[in-house]
A protein has these predicted regions:
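Surface-exposed beta-strand edges and their flanking turn/coil or helix-capping segments
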Residues: 3, 9, 44-48, 73, ...
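Short, low-complexity, Pro/Ser/Thr/Gly-rich segments in the mature regions of secreted, periplasmic
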Residues: 150-164
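Membrane pore-forming effector domains from diverse proteins
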Residues: 91-151
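A residue-identity detector for tryptophan
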Residues: 76, 133, 148, 161-162
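Membrane-insertion modules used to breach or fuse lipid bilayers
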Residues: 52-108
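Polar/charged side chains located within well-ordered beta-strands of beta-rich proteins
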Residues: 4-5, 15-18, 64, 92, ...
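N-terminal prepro-regions of secreted/extracellular proteins
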Residues: 1-51
Length: 164
């Protein structure tokens, strides 16, 4: 068994849940969120797969769209500021569809293919960010923590080849 992997990013992400209102603190603390980096992260297997024999075109459009949520490990008191800086709500659920097709080759890596299976995994944009704070009494920025937030961005596919 040999695996090839590729990502399909979806720009038509549909937000499907209501926004949760931000909790505002009454303190005089000001938080600053600084973006550090953004990477792609492969999530859980969706349970969706399709397989076929050589010469058959396996269609991804037969797979249904799935809904999965954004998430974060950010502290509740800086969540609103972090969401505004990154541009998405960490509590929303997103529905992402996918479509396309791939023909199963008769040979792969010089070997005869018995069948191939295409498996779909969730794909996230993972943002890492740093939070600092100041107040009316503390002017020098103080480190508060480093956090992450993930937003659904598409699907990661694994094409598994089984040989004769």
């Amino acid at each position: 068994e040999v695996v090839e992997e590729f990502n399909v990013f979806n720009t038509d992400v549909i937000e499907t849940t209501e926004e949760i209102p931000d909790i505002q603190t009454r303190s005089h603390i000001t938080y600053k969120v600084t973006k550090l980096n953004r990477t792609s992260e492969i999530g859980a297997y969706t349970g969706q797969s399709v397989s076929g024999e050589p010469g058959v075109t396996i269609s991804l459009s037969q797979m249904k769209a799935t809904s999965f949520s954004a998430s974060s490990n950010v502290a509740w008191n800086v969540k609103g500021k972090a969401q505004a800086t990154l541009g998405f709500n960490f509590s929303k659920s997103y529905t992402i569809g996918h479509s396309g097709s791939r023909k199963v080759p008769s040979t792969h890596n010089g070997r005869k293919v018995k069948r191939a299976e295409l498996k779909a995994y969730r794909l996230y944009d993972k943002h890492t960010f740093k939070v600092t704070w100041t107040s009316i009494h503390v002017k020098q920025p103080q480190y508060y923590g480093t956090y992450w937030a993930k937003k659904p961005s598409g699907y990661h596919y694994k094409m598994v080849y089984y040989y004769k």
